[in-house]
């Protein structure tokens, strides 16, 4: 096996530090200095190229990719096949001049082979341990199958449910988004990147991608810096502080300059202010798309991106085809190219690829570590913890395992549709909801199934998702379902979105359930039988009619490989739901963007005053607020107690406490949430902001005092000069079960 010839000193360093050679950056620097001293300009530029094949106009055809690697013109590529990775790595190591190994990247967003709930659902667990565990398992499986680099976590703050990629993020709150971002980075990268079960993480999409205008993917973004720093940047910064190895630029504009070519964003902020020391990769063809933004031809935008601090070009082939010419013309410098090349080589070094290029390419390890029963059991547990109980007015849930249970709906007998966006799908160990219900009740109850309706009969939506429109069939299906459920004691109606209605390029202007599904729901209500409405979806939906009609509503999201079994664990009470929403559910799409931590208005809503901030046809408040979620038991909150009403100085500490009691008949978990409001500051501040929470478990009748420690760090924000400070004054402290239903008290904090 051909490897790069290491210097004697570098070899000693690698041996001395065993699995942690990067502990001594001098050894890494020495190694890379010597390697780059041997590299030609073409080979250096080649390290900056992430492509799936040959180079247009130079190498093409079936042998294009192989020859590109032999010439040293490829630094990374994508894919998901272990055998292919092995073949390509052997070409890179054995047949290229210097034997530099490749990186293999893949969108491992919420699992590799064992698929966990979509990230939006994961965030509703309010459990960073489980979230980190899901990323750890994803890294174990991906690394066992040749993947060295995941394009995750996506940490974009999203306040617009029309945007399909809201499914890939952690909701609307910057503080909680930051905690999740750090947990995902830890899960992927572990505590030592040289271990064979770790992979490079990639923070994305930097920056502001979740603020696309009108919720339309790839659309423009226009935002003040003060809003960026206070409301959108915290999760990105948290991922950097957690040590994310790479960053992906976003498609959108940032201050009228594409993020991919924005030096203030990629260098001044990311590197100089935040201290990021990894490499930055473009999103798919986002260098080329700068031409569509109006910034010039491929050569011009490629030079602009490199100068901005964009190290690797994904799929544009702009760097590999134009940077050499740009260097000759003085558009880029040799230092720019060398710096980008060094950053890519450092990532490979930190992974241990120069020591063993095949460390991720072990078929036996792939077989042993992939899609195991242990991983599936964990996925089932996490799926159950991610479910949010939206309504249970008449105690219909949990269901009894007796009588006749009808499972109805266009998603009731599906598996693939429950996995969610961005995932490889293997249904071998998965179940449909019908199958999972049958497994749960065994011979204790009879289970019947009816499809009931089409997913949609709306022409554009059906065409976009490969469905046919047939209103006549829908009417027939509804009638058949009504006939089939006539002997049922209870009905489980599984409605929502298939997996290809959310994710990239899946924006929806109407986020209600399609009329075809509502036709079935109306017919089921007319039977007079108890109906549990189960929602499988990748975004918040508008559910005002459903909320007014159904006694029990369960938000199951797209739950991954174990979606159905995790769901029935909740439906039948094996798991008491404890999930809480991390994104606001609007009453109408016309309220969007709608989020809990909004700014004040000069004319707060007053229903008796016409000239105040409100709608004529709907209330301002959401249907379900941020932090909302019910349990099969009930909890009561005592008054909020502060240990003092006045606090002094930087070192001051305030303790806020509340007594929480389980007033129901079942043991359950409650997410006790702390919010702080700053009613008078140098700039207008949000009405309240999440600052902490505790997830507690209480037995029936048990009571516990829950306390939060508050310091000036919890009061800080970016002021008009973008200084991260806290200001003295009066503060509102809130503790409660969600962002709307809280206990409150006030404290004065003096300098």
What are these regions (language model features)?
Residues 16-719, 725-741, 748-751:
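Glycoside hydrolase catalytic-domain context in secreted enzymes
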Residues 1-23:
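Bacterial Sec-dependent N-terminal signal peptides
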């Amino acid at each position: 096996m051909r490897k790069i010839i290491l210097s004697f000193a570098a070899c000693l360093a690698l041996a001395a530090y065993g699995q942690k050679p990067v502990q001594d950056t001098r050894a890494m620097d020495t190694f890379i200095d010597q390697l780059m001293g041997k590299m030609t300009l073409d080979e250096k530029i080649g390290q900056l190229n992430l492509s799936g094949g040959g180079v247009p106009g130079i190498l093409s055809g079936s042998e294009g990719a192989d020859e590109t690697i032999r010439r040293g013109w490829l630094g990374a590529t994508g894919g998901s096949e272990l055998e292919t990775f092995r073949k390509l790595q052997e070409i890179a190591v054995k047949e290229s001049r210097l034997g530099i190994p490749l990186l293999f990247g893949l969108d491992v967003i919420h699992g590799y082979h064992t698929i966990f709930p979509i990230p939006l659902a994961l965030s509703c667990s309010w459990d960073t341990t489980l979230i980190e565990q899901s990323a750890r398992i994803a890294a174990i499986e991906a690394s066992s199958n040749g993947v060295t680099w995941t394009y995750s976590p996506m940490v974009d703050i999203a306040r617009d449910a029309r945007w399909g990629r809201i499914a890939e993020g952690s909701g609307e709150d910057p503080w909680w988004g930051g905690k999740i971002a750090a947990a995902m980075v830890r899960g992927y990268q572990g505590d030592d990147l040289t271990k064979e079960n770790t992979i490079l993480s990639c923070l994305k999409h930097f920056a502001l991608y979740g603020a696309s205008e009108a919720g339309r993917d790839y659309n423009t973004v226009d935002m003040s810096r003060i809003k960026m720093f206070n409301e959108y940047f915290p999760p990105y910064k948290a991922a950097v502080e957690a040590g994310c190895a790479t960053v992906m630029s976003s498609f959108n504009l940032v201050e009228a300059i594409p993020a991919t070519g924005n030096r203030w964003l990629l260098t001044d902020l990311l590197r100089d202010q935040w201290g990021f020391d990894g490499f930055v990769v473009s999103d798919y063809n986002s260098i080329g798309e700068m031409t569509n933004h109006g910034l010039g031809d491929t050569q011009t935008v490629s030079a602009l991106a490199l100068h901005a601090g964009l190290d690797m070009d994904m799929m544009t082939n702009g760097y590999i085809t134009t940077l050499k010419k740009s260097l000759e013309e003085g558009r880029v410098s040799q230092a720019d190219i060398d710096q980008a090349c060094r950053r890519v080589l450092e990532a490979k070094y930190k992974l241990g690829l120069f020591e063993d290029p095949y460390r991720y390419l072990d078929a036996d390890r792939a077989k042993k570590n992939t899609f195991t029963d242990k991983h599936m059991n964990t996925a089932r547990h996490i799926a159950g913890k991610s479910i949010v109980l939206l309504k249970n007015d008449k105690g219909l849930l949990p269901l009894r395992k007796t009588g006749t249970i009808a499972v109805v709906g266009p998603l009731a007998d599906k598996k693939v549709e429950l996995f969610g966006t961005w995932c490889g799908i293997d249904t071998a160990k998965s179940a449909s909801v019908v199958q999972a219900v049958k497994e749960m009740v065994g011979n204790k109850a009879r289970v019947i199934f009816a499809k009931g309706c089409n997913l949609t009969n709306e022409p554009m939506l059906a065409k976009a998702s490969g469905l046919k429109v047939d209103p006549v069939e829908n009417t027939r299906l509804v009638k058949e379902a009504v006939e089939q459920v006539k002997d049922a004691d209870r009905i489980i109606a599984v409605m929502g979105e298939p997996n290809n209605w959310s994710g990239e390029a899946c924006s929806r202007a109407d986020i209600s359930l399609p009329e075809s599904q509502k036709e079935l729901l109306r017919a089921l209500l007319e039977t007079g039988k108890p109906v549990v409405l189960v929602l499988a979806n990748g975004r918040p939906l508008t559910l005002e009619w459903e909320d007014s009609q159904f006694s029990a509503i369960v938000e199951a999201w797209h739950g991954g490989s174990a979606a159905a079994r995790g769901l029935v664990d909740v439906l039948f009470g094996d798991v008491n739901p404890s999930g809480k929403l991390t994104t606001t559910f609007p009453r109408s799409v016309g309220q969007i963007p709608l989020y809990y931590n909004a700014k004040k208005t000069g004319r707060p809503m007053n229903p008796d005053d016409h000239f105040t901030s409100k709608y004529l046809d709907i209330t301002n408040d959401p249907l379900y607020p941020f932090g909302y979620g019910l349990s099969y038991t009930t909890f009561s909150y005592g008054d909020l107690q502060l240990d003092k009403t006045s606090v002094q100085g930087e070192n001051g500490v305030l303790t806020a406490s509340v007594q929480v009691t389980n007033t129901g008949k079942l043991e359950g978990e409650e997410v006790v949430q702390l919010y702080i409001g700053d009613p008078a500051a140098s700039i207008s501040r949000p009405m309240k902001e999440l600052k902490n929470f505790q997830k507690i478990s209480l037995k029936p009748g048990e009571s516990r005092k829950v306390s939060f420690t508050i310091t000036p760090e919890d009061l800080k924000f970016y002021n008009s000069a973008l200084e991260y400070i806290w200001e003295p004054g009066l503060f509102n402290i809130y503790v409660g079960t969600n962002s709307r239903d809280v206990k409150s008290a006030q404290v004065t904090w003096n300098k």
